[in-house]
A protein has these predicted regions:
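Two-component histidine phosphotransfer core
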Residues: 1-126
Length: 130
């Protein structure tokens, strides 16, 4: 995508389609995507959340048992909270996200928080509304 920003709603739709496509090739997981707040009025950089979702899919594929992935987006004022969690797979390690942290730092400076714990990724962003 050559745009600098896309609607959060479009990004959520893209991630939903990505998970549906992954599920076509492997019926090893189910997923749920939920969104609260004004996702149709907030802009974010394209593909901002994709690396987190890809990491969850990779971890699910690493296990021989059926798993699930949950994505939750919550917009409150000028804050976005994104939570990606999965119930099977290897445990996550914060060092796995060093390049993503670099991108977030370039985009948001100190206006973000990224937490990685076991099988959950939480990203909080403070955004500038146009």
């Amino acid at each position: 995508c050559s745009r600098k920003a896309v609607l959060l709603k479009a990004e959520i739709d893209f991630l939903t389609n990505y998970l549906a496509l992954e599920q076509v090739y492997s019926h090893r997981f189910q997923y749920m995507v939920s969104a609260e707040g004004e996702v149709h009025r907030i802009f974010v950089p394209p593909l901002l959340f994709l690396p987190f979702v890809q990491q969850a899919v990779i971890q699910i594929y690493s296990q021989p048992v059926f798993g699930s992935i949950d994505l939750n987006f919550h917009v409150n004022g000028n804050e976005i909270q994104f939570v990606c969690s999965f119930d099977n797979g290897n445990l996550l390690h914060p060092d796995d996200f060093s390049k993503i942290r670099q991108r977030l730092k370039l985009l948001y400076g100190n206006d973000y928080t990224l937490s990685v714990a076991k099988r959950t990724i939480m990203l909080k962003l403070k955004i500038q509304k146009p």
